[in-house]
């Protein structure tokens, strides 16, 4: 089902405000996790939020998750970075940016 879906909705906690911040962004699924790419790399507020507090909530279709986000280091994990870039290129014809992994730790029954 995730092959058909175009967007994931990711909620981070604002590192300055402490308020929830939700984005809509392209994604790919790989090996039980979800991956998104920040076009603006470290300048994206949501990346800064994840760097400071990796606890996230996210929605893929009608599935809601609590989990953790982390930036993928392409130097330390070249195979993972290459796989994610290939999937993004195949799905969206674009993969230029900072890769962030969304690791679902629990699914929220009933969507929230």
Map each language-model feature to its residues.
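Disordered, polybasic Ser/Thr-rich segments at the N-terminal boundary of pleckstrin homology
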Residues: 1-2
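Short beta-strand segments
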Residues: 5-39, 56
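Short, structured beta-strand-loop surface elements
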Residues: 41-111
């Amino acid at each position: 089902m995730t092959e058909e879906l175009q967007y994931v909705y990711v909620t981070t906690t604002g590192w300055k405000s402490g308020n929830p911040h939700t984005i809509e962004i392209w994604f790919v699924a790989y090996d039980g996790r979800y991956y998104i790419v920040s076009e603006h790399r470290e300048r994206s507020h949501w990346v800064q939020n994840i760097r400071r507090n990796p606890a996230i909530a996210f929605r893929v279709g009608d599935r809601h998750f609590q989990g953790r986000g982390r930036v993928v280091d392409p130097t330390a994990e070249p195979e993972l970075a290459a796989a994610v870039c290939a999937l993004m290129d195949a799905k969206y014809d674009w993969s230029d940016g900072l890769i962030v992994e969304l690791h679902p730790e629990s699914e929220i029954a009933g969507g929230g």
